[in-house]
């Protein structure tokens, strides 16, 4: 057990380093866009090409995680990310930036299924929620710390954060090669008999509703998260520091919740009920954000709504990991794919609605998240999962 805890610590440290690199470039990306005189449409397509590439590659990467191993896929993903950030740092043309973002999408498609499958192999059904909560917290913490460091580095040179991000990813890849050993497949992740083969597995009853909820919730969450900064800027006149305080505050509270409460909540409620309650919380608060006006009220609602998001995401990942048996890579790849679909189309639809009325993207998010709540009411855990808990 101690050996597995050390392995988990190494894995989460490498994941933190990778997402620290992602966070580094957040403050300086608009500066690069202004330097190259890119339009809002070009930036939107650039964001979409990351998600589309991740969408296309995720199913393949998921299969490869099961076929070739967890460690090699994580390392490949980190190397792709390192190259992606380096190219963005040296990029002087739109074409180079698009290539960079596409490589970034490939890296995400490899890393996340590999990490979740790795964790499934070194944990038991009972200890997995805590480990996946730690995984989400490591990602959140990287996003929290990264922008602050990136803003400091950008004072030296606007391209420096991208080179540091590339170096961090390369460091994480080297550490993974040197310190991680390919895990033995967990005997608890038994083969589930009688399931559909190939992509027909998407429509298997134990997966289908989970994937639908991932898709629908990703639509709602992406439309909310991608336009939150514009919303509070246009509606309330918030400054960049105000927005940073709210997002950082939400991320900190969310990370603490994932570490301290997520494991307890999954034991008390189970994943399906926790997903439902998180969706109810998020749906209510996204709508409430369109009605509040005071700074303190907006701050409290924003911080709390991110807690709902940060509980739902690892709950879905934990549920999929528990039901997937020996198909951990497949489940992780599909999770990534359906999330990517939402990340592609949610911001596009939200952006169109924002041009009509600043509140409309949040109404749209409220409706889509409410559909997710309705789906959870009909959602039942498969028999083999009930038997194991």
Curated annotation (Swiss-Prot):
InterPro entries: MFS, MFS_dom, MFS_trans_sf, Sugar_transporter_CS, Tet-R_TetA/multi-R_MdtG-like. Keywords: Antibiotic resistance, Cell membrane, Membrane, Transmembrane, Transmembrane helix, Transport. Energy-dependent efflux pump responsible for decreased drug accumulation in multi-drug-resistant cells. Probably uses a transmembrane proton gradient as the energy source. Causes the efflux of a variety of toxic substances, including such structurally diverse compounds as ethidium bromide, rhodamine and acridine dyes, tetraphenylphosphonium, puromycin, chloramphenicol, doxorubicin, and fluoroquinolone antibiotics. The keyword Transport applies. The keyword Cell membrane applies. It is a multi-pass membrane protein. PANTHER family: MAJOR FACILITATOR SUPERFAMILY DOMAIN-CONTAINING PROTEIN 10 (PTHR23504), MULTIDRUG RESISTANCE PROTEIN 2 (PTHR23504:SF115). GO terms for cellular component: plasma membrane. This is Multidrug resistance protein 1. Belongs to the major facilitator superfamily. TCR/Tet family. It is found in: Cell membrane. It comes from Bacillus subtilis (strain 168). GO terms for biological process: response to antibiotic. Gene3D superfamilies: MFS general substrate transporter like domains (1.20.1250.20). GO terms for molecular function: transmembrane transporter activity. It holds the Pfam family MFS_1. It comes from the Bacteria. The chain crosses the membrane at residues 6-26, 42-62, 71-91, 102-122, 134-154, 160-180, 202-222, 243-263, 286-306, 336-356, 358-378.
């Amino acid at each position: 057990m101690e050996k597995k805890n050390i392995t988990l610590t190494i894995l989460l440290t490498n994941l933190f380093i990778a997402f620290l690199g992602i966070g580094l470039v957040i403050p300086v990306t608009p500066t690069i866009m202004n330097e190259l005189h890119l339009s809002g449409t070009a930036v939107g397509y650039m964001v979409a090409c990351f998600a589309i590439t991740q969408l296309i590659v995720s199913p393949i990467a998921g299969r490869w995680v099961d076929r070739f191993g967890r460690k090699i896929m994580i390392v490949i993903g980190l190397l792709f990310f390192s190259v992606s950030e380096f190219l963005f740092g040296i990029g002087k043309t739109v074409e180079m930036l698009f290539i960079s973002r596409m490589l970034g999408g490939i890296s995400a498609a490899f890393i996340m299924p590999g990490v979740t499958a790795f964790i499934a192999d070194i944990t038991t059904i009972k200890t997995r929620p805590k480990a996946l909560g730690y995984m989400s917290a490591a990602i959140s913490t990287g996003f929290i710390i990264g922008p602050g460091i990136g803003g400091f580095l950008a004072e030296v040179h606007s391209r420096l954060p991208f080179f540091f991000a590339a170096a961090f990813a390369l460091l994480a890849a080297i550490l993974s090669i040197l310190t991680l050993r390919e895990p033995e497949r967990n005997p608890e992740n038994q083969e589930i008999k009688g399931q559909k083969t190939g992509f027909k597995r998407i429509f298997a009853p134990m997966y289908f509703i989970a994937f639908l909820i991932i898709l629908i919730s990703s639509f709602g969450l992406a439309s909310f998260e991608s336009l939150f900064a514009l919303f509070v800027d246009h509606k309330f006149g918030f400054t960049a520091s105000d927005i940073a305080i709210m997002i950082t505050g939400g991320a900190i509270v969310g990370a603490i919740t994932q570490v301290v409460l997520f494991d307890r909540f999954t034991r008390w409620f189970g994943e399906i009920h926790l997903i439902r309650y998180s969706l109810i919380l998020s749906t209510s608060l996204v709508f409430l954000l369109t009605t509040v006006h005071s700074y303190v009220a907006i701050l409290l609602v924003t911080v709390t709504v991110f807690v709902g998001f940060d509980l739902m995401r690892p709950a879905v990942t934990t549920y999929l990991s528990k039901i997937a048996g020996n198909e951990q890579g497949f489940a992780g790849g599909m999770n990534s794919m359906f999330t990517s679909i939402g990340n592609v189309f949610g911001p596009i639809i939200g952006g169109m609605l924002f041009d009509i009325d600043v509140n409309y993207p949040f109404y749209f998010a409220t409706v889509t998240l409410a559909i997710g709540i309705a789906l959870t009411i009909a959602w039942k855990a498969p028999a083999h999962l009930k038997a194991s808990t």
